[in-house]
Regions:
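Conserved RecA-like ASCE P-loop NTPase motor core of nucleic-acid helicases/translocases
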Residues: 7-19
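ATPase catalytic-site recognition across NTP-hydrolyzing enzymes
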Residues: 143-195
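Walker A/P-loop NTP-binding motif
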Residues: 1-5
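Hydrophobic/aromatic beta-strand patches that form the interior of the parallel beta-sheet core
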Residues: 10, 58, 75, 110, ...
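Walker B catalytic acidic pair
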Residues: 77-79
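Short, conserved catalytic or adaptor-binding loops enriched in Gly and charged residues
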Residues: 46-50, 126-135, 182, 186-192
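ASCE P-loop NTPase helicase motor core
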Residues: 81-158
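Inter-Walker segment of RecA-like/P-loop motor cores
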Residues: 18-72, 171
């Protein structure tokens, strides 16, 4: 879309380092940045497209980094790991910053990631699934539908709750999560053997 509708776009993650590792190199390649008239800004992590659009790579460890720019759209990976109040305090208001040059345009945002207990991501997904608000939708891409062999291998080494959370996008309770693998069902009488 950034090639068709000029403006500011973002690719964000919970921390600046994560955003850089997840997005920066891939976006440089996918956008064919070596062919752009204006070189990427390496210190601010901004790719300047020939269409006039900019793609900003942002860390939301300081959620105010997203504020003050009239965004066209963007995506946030690992959304469950951002600060709990960042959506309401920073991100949603930033998406609604009106561009005086294009006052009727409304920014969009993809919230990506796997669940992490019943936190702010869960609350927003529940609200999206139960409301009649056409601005919010929830989509699931389960590993078993895309990579069935990978899903089967994961089932062998993960607890049921962890598998459901990581591979089926299921919101599992956080209560007792640390201890679930230490239940009596997992006890063994096997003796550790010398090597």
């Amino acid at each position: 879309q950034a090639n068709k509708i000029p403006g500011a776009y973002f690719a964000a993650a919970p921390t600046h380092d994560q955003a850089k590792k997840i997005f920066w190199d891939d976006l440089l390649k996918f956008s064919l940045s070596s062919t752009h008239v204006k070189r990427p800004n390496l210190s601010d992590r901004i790719i300047h497209l020939n269409s006039g659009s900019e793609i900003h790579v942002l860390g939301l460890d300081k959620p105010q980094r997203i504020e003050g720019i009239p965004w066209k759209g963007g995506g946030i990976d690992e959304f469950a790991d951002i600060k709990p109040d960042a959506w309401e305090s920073n991100i949603y208001p930033a998406l609604n910053t009106v561009n005086p040059v294009d006052p009727d345009y409304r920014a969009w945002c993809w919230l990506l990631g796997v669940p992490d207990g019943l936190n702010h991501y869960y609350d927003l997904c529940q609200k999206s699934e139960t409301s009649q608000d056409a601005n919010f939708k929830v989509f699931h891409w389960m590993t078993s539908e895309i990579f069935p062999e990978m899903a089967e291998d994961a089932k062998k080494v993960m607890s049921i709750k962890q598998y459901k959370q990581e591979f089926e996008a299921s919101f599992e309770t956080a209560a007792g999560r640390i201890y679930e693998d230490y239940s009596t069902a997992n006890h063994t009488t096997e003796v550790i053997k010398e090597h």
